[in-house]
Each structure stands twice: as structure tokens, then as C-alpha cells.
């Protein structure tokens, strides 16, 4: 989880997107696969969390709320983490909208990805069996004059404190436990994530 907006090697390559063709009364209609899944109220959060991705995800959530404020939204997460401010815009939208947001981890949910995973509606947070979750404290990488570095250090400590409070709220852990466990990288299996309170259960297959 970074406090800077720099891209890294985890940025997704979205050049090749499968298309789905459906028959309608007016003939054939084609969608990219993600647009088709959006019709089923499924949103994908994959790759590094950054501003462009966050804008797309928040827009999709607001659109689905406008379509049906009573029906759940399903957020599938496979992310190594990313920029804190971008992630917090997704988090705040999840808490703001009326529909419950069910979160599902597939692959990995690390850093900001793990934070968003546990921010789903209580009882509706899931991991697939071989997924991995990692929690840690925010990362700082600011460079510049000493005074500016001091200002940014104070800001990142405030952000760290706020995120620990929110993580404690969503997991049911004490603030002291969260502070201790996020001091360094902590990796959890799907079952360990359930035990920790990050998610509610492990999905093995659909009913």
C-alpha cells in the first residue's frame, strides 16, 4: 500500500479483452466480458489500485446503485495493493451506497486489496480456497526537502492510524492487535483470513 501514485510492474494489461455475443430481438449484440458481467452486478478489482481503476470501480458501483438500490453488488478482488487515496475512494463509496457490497478474493488480496476485501458487507466477505491475503502498514516513498519529508511522515502516520481503526472495526480485532499484526507483512491463507476476521467464509464451489 503506497502513498504515492507511481505505477509499477503490477499494472494490468487490458489490451486483449474477450467479447461475448448475445442474440436479441434486434439481432446480435456484443459486449466485452466485463461489461456483460456488470449486467449481473459483478465488478472486478484486478491489478494495482490506482486512480483510473478507482474511478472506474466507483462509477460502476454508483451505476448499479442507481439501477437497483436493494440488490447486492459483487466485488471480485485480485490485487497486490496500490495507492492509498485511490483505495480509500473505493472504500468510502462501498460504505456510502445503499446496496451491500459482497467481496470475494481470488488469487491475492494484499495491502489495499486486503483492506477493501474486509470492507465488504458483514457476512458477505469470502475467499476462494487457494487465495492469499496480506496485511501491513502503509508504505511511504516521498523524497524532497527535509521539512517536506517531515510533513509527509506526519500525514502517513495519521493515515496509518485511521486505517488501523477501520481494520479493527471490520475484523472485530482490538486496535492493539491490528497495530501489532500490520507492523510487518503478514500473509494469511483463506482459512487463516476467516479466523482473523478479514473474511466470513471460504467458497469452494457454487451451491
Curated annotation (Swiss-Prot):
Pfam families: CLP_protease. One of its GO terms (cellular component) is cytoplasm. Its EC number is 3.4.21.92. It catalyses: Hydrolysis of proteins to small peptides in the presence of ATP and magnesium. alpha-casein is the usual test substrate. In the absence of ATP, only oligopeptides shorter than five residues are hydrolyzed (such as succinyl-Leu-Tyr-|-NHMec, and Leu-Tyr-Leu-|-Tyr-Trp, in which cleavage of the -Tyr-|-Leu- and -Tyr-|-Trp bonds also occurs). It comes from the Bacteria. Disulfide bonds: none annotated. This is ATP-dependent Clp protease proteolytic subunit. It comes from Yersinia enterocolitica serotype O:8 / biotype 1B (strain NCTC 13174 / 8081).
Amino acid at each position: 500500500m503506497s502513498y504515492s501514485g507511481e505505477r509499477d510492474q503490477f499494472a494490468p494489461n487490458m489490451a486483449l479483452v474477450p467479447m461475448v455475443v448475445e442474440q436479441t430481438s434486434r439481432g446480435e449484440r456484443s459486449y466485452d466480458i466485463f461489461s456483460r458481467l456488470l449486467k449481473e452486478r459483478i465488478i472486478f478489482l484486478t491489478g494495482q489500485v490506482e486512480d483510473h481503476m478507482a474511478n472506474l470501480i466507483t462509477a460502476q458501483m454508483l451505476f448499479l446503485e442507481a439501477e437497483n438500490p436493494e440488490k447486492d453488488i459483487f466485488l471480485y478482488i485480485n490485487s497486490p495493493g496500490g495507492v492509498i487515496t485511490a483505495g480509500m475512494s473505493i472504500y468510502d463509496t462501498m460504505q456510502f451506497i445503499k446496496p451491500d457490497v459482497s467481496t470475494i478474493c481470488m488469487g491475492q488480496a494484499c495491502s489495499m486489496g486486503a483492506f477493501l476485501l474486509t470492507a465488504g458487507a458483514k457476512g458477505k466477505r469470502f475467499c476462494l480456497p487457494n487465495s492469499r491475503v496480506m496485511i501491513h502498514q502503509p508504505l511511504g516513498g516521498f523524497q524532497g526537502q527535509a521539512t517536506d519529508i517531515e510533513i509527509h511522515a506526519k500525514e502517513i502516520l495519521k493515515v496509518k492510524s485511521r486505517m488501523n481503526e477501520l481494520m479493527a472495526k471490520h475484523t472485530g480485532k482490538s486496535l492493539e492487535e491490528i497495530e501489532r499484526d500490520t507492523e510487518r507483512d503478514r500473509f494469511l491463507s483463506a482459512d487463516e483470513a476467516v479466523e482473523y476476521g478479514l473474511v466470513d467464509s471460504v467458497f469452494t464451489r457454487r451451491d
